[in-house]
Amino acid sequence: MISSRSIAVSAVFGFGLGFTSVAWADTASDACGALASARTALYSMINAKDVSAQDALNAKVREASTKLDSVLAGMTGADAKAAADFKALWEQFKATRDNQIIPAIYKGNAAEAKKIADGIQSERLSKMWSIMSCK
């Protein structure tokens, strides 16, 4: 005979598993959204012609990056492996962006910035997208 206690334990356990997948989906979705925002703002920055527009877009890049860093820091348990794999690429992505792409933009060399963004950065973006199962 099934006791009400085993039903309650099963219900709580089942709810916990359901909550975990929802939490992963929300966290991954937040990471994907922040990554897309950072990439979109950077691409807009490459195409912007005046410094004030570039500065405003750079602020958006930084804001999205900060949000993504925060989401990654909050990923624990089963999500920690994906976060670690993602973060390794994300750190490379940020370094290239901050040390090569953004300086090229501010020097007026949009073609060089775009070349880097469409090259190695695009490869990294694709890998990060895959790790988080972004859609």
Name the predicted role of every residue range.
Residues 26-84, 104-118:
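Membrane-proximal N-terminal soluble sensing/regulatory segments of transmembrane proteins
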Residues 92-96:
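Extended, amphipathic, non-transmembrane alpha-helical segments
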Residues 100-101:
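Transmembrane alpha-helical segments of integral membrane proteins
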Residues 116-135:
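Extracytoplasmic
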